């Protein structure tokens, strides 16, 4: 389920984040930039008690601040005896440190104690592997020069391969780990035809045209495009897919918030 599809400063949709549900448990990837994540979960019919795993790609506000609210919601559920087990949180050291420090500074002493007791923190390193929510996952640094960030390659119980490149263009260092995905998830800040207006490259982002090129060079079978501007929502699906299709002949999905994609 795609909880949000927008870039940092969107107001007409939520920031990019999603949940992968393989029937074992649910993995949330990022949480957007505020307590709107609670609204998105409610609209998607996902109870906080059903979120057992959370992976954070990096510590930018539009990805990590929503995680503070997820953590607080878990604490609240624990106090109501409505959350079993622990919330498993994954990320590289910096993003884990940022999340933990914000929670320490903003939670009551009692709530932060519950947070510490009922979370399992897993600090990831480049190339490490984990079994999470039924998936075999390999995490990798995207080699960002802006903010340390990780993506992943996951294999579902059904054998489908999902590659998430984070919210920056592909770095050639990750070409091998990103090859031949059944589903490639990549950002596109805007259409290439509107690059002069939005200046995506200055923000370490790319365009729908670039997303199509990336999917083609990586031999992906399906492409999901997200982390976009929100000025073109009524026409976004058609326009972005058409531009990406100039270079990519596979299946292209440009989801709206709360859309579900069957992997």
Segments predicted by a language model, with ranges:
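Short histidine/acidic/glycine/proline-rich micro-motifs that form metal-
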Residues: 6-8, 89, 95-96, 228-233
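Active-site-proximal loop/helix segment associated with metal-binding centers of metalloenzymes
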Residues: 10-12, 123-193
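Active-site neighborhood of phospho(di)ester-bond hydrolases with catalytic His/Asp-centered motifs
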Residues: 29-32, 51-59, 92, 162-168, ...
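Active-site metal-binding motif and surrounding structural segment of the metallo-beta-lactamase
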Residues: 35-87
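Short, glycine/acidic-enriched loop or turn micro-motifs at the edges of active sites
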Residues: 7, 24, 33, 61, ...
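Cap/insert and terminal regions of metallo-dependent hydrolase folds
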Residues: 169-258
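Metallo-beta-lactamase
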Residues: 83-148, 253, 257
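Conserved beta-strand hairpin/beta-sheet module of binuclear metal-dependent hydrolase folds
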Residues: 1-44, 148-166
């Amino acid at each position: 389920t795609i909880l949000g599809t927008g870039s940092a400063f969107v107001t007409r949709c939520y920031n990019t984040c999603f949940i992968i549900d393989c029937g074992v448990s649910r993995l949330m990837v990022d949480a957007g930039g505020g307590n709107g994540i609670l609204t998105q979960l409610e609209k998607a019919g996902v109870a906080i008690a059903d979120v057992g795993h959370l992976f954070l790609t990096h510590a930018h506000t539009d990805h990590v601040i929503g995680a503070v609210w997820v953590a607080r919601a878990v604490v609240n559920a624990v106090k109501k005896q409505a959350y079993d087990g622990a919330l498993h949180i994954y990320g590289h050291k910096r993003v884990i440190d940022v999340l933990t420090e914000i929670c320490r500074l903003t939670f009551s002493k009692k709530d932060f104690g519950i947070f510490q007791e009922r979370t399992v923190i897993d600090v990831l390193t480049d190339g490490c592997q984990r079994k999470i929510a039924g998936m075999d996952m390999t995490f990798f640094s995207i080699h960002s020069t802006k903010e340390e960030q990780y993506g992943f390659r996951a294999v579902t119980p059904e054998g489908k391969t999902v590659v998430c490149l984070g919210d920056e263009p592909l770095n050639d260092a990750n070409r091998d780990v990103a090859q031949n995905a059944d589903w490639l998830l990549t950002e596109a800040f805007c259409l290439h035809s509107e690059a002069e207006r939005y200046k995506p490259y200055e923000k370490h982002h790319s365009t729908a045209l670039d997303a199509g090129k990336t999917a083609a060079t990586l031999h992906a079978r399906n492409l999901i495009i997200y982390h976009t501007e929100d000025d073109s929502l009524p026409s976004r699906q058609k326009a972005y897919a058409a531009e990406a299709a100039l270079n990519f002949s596979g299946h292209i999905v440009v989801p709206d918030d709360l859309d579900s994609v069957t992997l």
